[in-house]
Regions:
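Long, low-complexity segments enriched in small/aliphatic residues
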Residues: 1-71
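Long, contiguous, secondary-structure-rich segments that constitute the structural scaffold
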Residues: 66-82, 86-178
Length: 178
């Protein structure tokens, strides 16, 4: 069945971005059916010119599911921090430069190379999750490359969203070119 031939199974029979079904539930007392913005409490918000939110992401070449196939990710994974050209120019950072990242919430530091790209908005950074920054003490020599980059979870506070319990994977850091 397609919605064109039969109505959706929502209370209105139409596509709903948020279901008004929630409004009629006893547990929905004092809950607005419409989404609203609430600033996150999972991390400190950037204030200085060299402070950024890192949005972490995944793809088929860099996620926890491919850790079983570690060696191929040496060639397909990206262990760099992506930065918008506007921010890079302002901070004097060029493609391939190494930066030090320091957590705003946790006293953690790491280093990574920078990819300057328009694929990330100004004022934020991007890093693939699970793609680098391994800190295991003993590694086979052919796997030393897994130490490259950072693991964004180093900087995460571990705070979860009260409504649904999901953890924040985005973090805030202070950066400097090294």
């Amino acid at each position: 069945q397609t919605p064109y031939k039969a109505p959706f199974t929502t209370p209105t029979g139409k596509g709903e971005i948020i279901s008004f079904y929630a409004v009629y539930q006893p547990s929905a007392k004092n809950t607005s059916p419409m989404p609203e913005y609430q600033p996150t409490k999972a991390y400190k918000h950037p204030k200085a010119d060299n402070e950024f939110i890192i949005a972490s992401g995944k793809d088929s070449a860099s996620c926890c599911g491919v850790t079983l196939f570690t060696y191929p990710t040496r060639f397909t994974g990206d262990r760099t921090i992506w930065m918008n050209p506007i921010d890079a120019a302002r901070l004097g950072i060029k493609q391939g430069d190494t930066i030090e990242l320091e957590g705003l919430d946790l006293p953690v530091k790491g280093r990574a190379q920078v990819t300057v790209t328009n694929r990330v908005i100004a004022g934020s950074l991007f890093a693939y999750g699970f793609s680098g920054g391994v800190r295991t003490k003993k590694l086979l020599p052919e796997y030393e490359w897994v130490r490259e980059g950072v693991n964004t979870n180093w900087f995460a506070t571990g705070k979860s969203q009260a409504d649904c319990g999901n953890m924040s994977n985005n973090v805030t850091v202070r950066i400097k070119r090294v």
